[in-house]
C-alpha cells in the first residue's frame, strides 16, 4: 500500500490509535480517515477525468469520474484491470456499500451529528472493510 499511496501509512497508524481509544469521537475520526484513504487511493490509481458513457442494457449510462466520485473511479479501475467479471462485481459491490456508508457518516458529521459511529465495533468493521477492499484493488496493480 505504501508504494501506491504513501500517505495512507500515516493515516492507517492514526486509525489504529483512534480505534484503541475509549472516545467515540476518535472512532468517528478513524472512519473519516478510511474515507480519505479511499480518496487517496482513487487519486493514485485512477485520477479524476471526464465522465464516461457506457452501455447499460441498451441504454446509455453516464459514469461520473470527477474528483468527488472516488468510489466510481476505483470501480472503473477494477473493471478495467480485472480479468474476472465476478471479481469486478464483488469488489464493486463492496466499494459501493463501503463508499455509501462512509459518505453518509461524513455527511452526518458535517451537519453536526457527532454520534454517528455508536460503537467501537462498528468503527472496527469499517476499518477492516476498507483495508480488505484496498488490498483487493492494489492486488490488480
Can you annotate each of these PLM segments?
Residues 6-10, 18-141:
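Amphipathic, oligomerization/interface secondary-structure segments
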Residues 1-4:
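Long, contiguous internal "core" modules enriched in hydrophobic/ aromatic residues
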